[in-house]
Design a protein with these regions (language model features):
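Auxiliary Fe-S-binding modules of radical SAM enzymes
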Residues: 1-2, 68, 200, 206-329
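N-terminal cationic-hydrophobic initiation segments that often serve targeting/anchoring roles
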Residues: 8, 12, 68, 98, ...
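Hydrophobic faces of well-ordered beta-strands that scaffold small-molecule active sites
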Residues: 18-28, 75, 106-110, 140-142, ...
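Canonical Radical SAM [4Fe-4S] cluster-binding loop centered on the CxxxCxxC motif
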Residues: 20-59
Length: 329
């Protein structure tokens, strides 16, 4: 049996042959100021840069209002490792969002950001996760996962959280009943064996704590970054997508990365183990800074799904279906 056929058969516990999910959310980057200078990132700016920014409450209100108007259910909120923002700034932002927009889930602050908070605020990770959750954080994204092998991380992002740190934040989040996602960015300095090691570390963590709702893999986007590597083609992406589904059979949902791969490959990934097409991405800043810009609206996403014979359904962050099924013809 081919990797793609085996992966498809294993997807979504059989439901992958019927339903493909998607979400409506907005990727809000609260600051582009960052002091870890990752070689693979084109988004970061120094604090003194002319185009450095920190989002205001008024700006985030407008972005959330636009998201709600489009039927959105959450915001994905991440940012650079800002050296000067206080812990209270983050808690105030979360409290403000919860008070003004109680129906919006804040899927925010990657493990690497929490490690940054630990170091800057000199507080234990456990306390930070608890306090952020109490202020309104609903779930944690898998950003900063890259490859969970320290040899790789020392080469591409030596000032950012190492593998054990990333996994520790996820374990703490799961203890506090915060759902999280796991990610992998591949196609740079890692070996194939290190990709497998990454998948294995995610799998072992899921066996231990069970809090990963989904896994998302994407390829490194090199344009405008300091890290140069041969471009990973669509065939290699689809192979990794299928392998992820087979290896991570303890994570229910596998998401296609149309944001980095484009519509056609994003759709084909649904035949290579993915059961979710991700978000329409009302706003995206990090990948686009690296030269990759793809856009879709709800109709586009539904069409990609139905063209393969699946039923498109909108979901929330916890993969609960939030729309009514289409009426039978």
């Amino acid at each position: 049996m081919s990797r793609s056929r085996l992966a498809k058969a294993d997807a979504f516990e059989g439901r992958g042959n019927e339903i493909v999910t998607f979400s409506i959310d907005r990727n809000i980057n609260y600051t582009n100021v960052c002091n870890v200078y990752c070689k693979f990132c084109a988004f970061w700016r120094r604090e003194q840069a002319a185009d450095a920014y920190v989002i205001t409450h008024a700006e985030i209100d407008q972005k959330i209002e636009e998201t709600l108007a489009l039927g959105g259910t959450q915001i994905l909120m991440q940012g650079g490792h800002h050296p000067s923002l206080s812990k209270q700034w983050y808690l105030d932002l979360l409290s403000h969002i919860r008070e003004k927009f109680p129906t919006i889930n804040v899927h925010g602050f990657s493990p690497s950001e929490f490690v940054h908070f630990r170091d800057v605020f000199d507080e234990p990770l456990e306390d930070l996760v608890r306090d952020f959750a109490a202020a309104g954080l609903g779930s944690i994204p898998g950003g900063g996962g890259e490859i969970l092998v320290d040899r790789v991380r020392q080469k591409i992002s030596p000032l950012k959280a190492m593998s054990d740190d990333w996994l520790e934040v996820m374990a703490i989040a799961h203890r506090h009943n915060l759902a999280t996602t796991a990610t992998m960015m591949f196609g740079h300095v890692e070996t194939v064996e290190e990709r497998i090691e990454h998948l294995d570390r995610v799998r072992v963590q899921q066996d231990a704590t069970g809090g990963f709702t989904a896994f998302i893999a994407w390829t490194f986007q090199a344009e405008n970054t300091k890290l140069k590597a041969p471009t990973v083609g669509s065939h290699e992406y689809l192979r990794m997508q299928a392998l992820s589904r087979i290896y991570l059979d303890n994570i229910e949902n596998i998401q296609s990365s149309w944001v980095t791969q484009g519509r056609e490959i994003g759709q084909i990934a649904l035949r290579h183990g993915a059961n979710d097409l991700g978000s329409i991405m009302i706003e995206e800043n990090v990948v686009s800074k690296a030269g990759t810009v793809y856009c879709m609206d709800v109709a586009d996403m539904q069409r990609l799904i139905t063209d393969l014979g699946y039923e498109p359904r909108q979901r929330d962050n916890w993969y609960h279906l939030v729309d009514a099924p289409a009426a039978a013809a």
